[in-house]
From Swiss-Prot:
Keyword Transcription regulation attached: no
Note: Kluyveromyces marxianus proteins are shorter in length and have a more ordered secondary structure than their S.cerevisiae counterparts, which might contribute to the superior thermotolerance and solubility. K.marxianus could be therefore useful as a new model organism for further elucidation of the molecular details of autophagy.
Organism in which the protein naturally occurs: Kluyveromyces marxianus (strain DMKU3-1042 / BCC 29191 / NBRC 104275) (Yeast)
Region span, Disordered: 119-145
GO BP: autophagosome assembly; protein transport
UniProt protein name: Autophagy-related protein 29
Family assignment from sequence similarity: Belongs to the ATG29 family.
Keywords from the UniProt entry: Autophagy, Protein transport, Transport
Consequences of knocking out this gene: Mislocalizes ATG8 in the cytosol, when ATG11 is also deleted.
Coiled-coil region: none
GO CC terms of this entry: phagophore assembly site
Length: 162
């Protein structure tokens, strides 16, 4: 169905009321939808919206703009809902901090400060072990060294001279 060559006629039973004026035809498209959404999404409250001015700017009747606004809000809320349901769970600030801590620890493990690799269990101490042959790796660290997160942070601060 093409907007340019399709006309719809609606027959309403009864007489036209006195003073009835046919609404002016108008064109609506994505560009105007975007303008409408930009205007309505920024308003603080319903009283802030000047519908008459918006009607003049967009060249559409007030009733159409209100219905279209409702549809746009509904569409954006649905998209937001889908985004929230797609993510497994919302991240709390604690989760974010823990992931940052783990990233810092992993970076420390790969840095020159610590030559050995560590397995990082959740919020526990880090144990390093030498290879299976108990060969000296050239490091001062012994095979059963246990390092806490705060010790790693202190080592980093010393290294960075902070």
């Amino acid at each position: 169905m093409n907007n340019e060559n399709t006309k719809v006629y609606i027959r309403v039973s009864g007489k036209r009321p006195e003073g009835f004026i046919d609404p002016k035809p108008f064109e609506w498209g994505f560009k105007r939808d975007k303008i409408l959404w930009t205007r309505i999404s920024k308003m603080e409250s319903l009283e802030d919206m000047d519908w008459k001015e918006l009607c003049q700017d967009l060249g559409a009747p007030e009733s159409f703009l209100k219905k279209r606004s409702y549809m746009l809000f509904q569409k954006h809320l649905k998209l937001l809902s889908e985004q929230m349901s797609d993510s497994p769970r919302m991240r709390s600030p604690l989760d974010t901090r823990n992931s940052v801590d783990e990233t810092i620890l992993q970076n420390l493990q790969a840095s020159k400060i610590l030559n050995n690799r560590f397995d990082v269990p959740n919020n526990e101490t880090l144990d390093t072990t030498t290879n299976k042959n108990n060969e000296e790796s050239g490091s001062d660290l012994s095979s059963s060294l246990s390092v806490s997160k705060s010790a790693l942070e202190d080592a980093l601060m010393d290294r960075l001279q902070l």
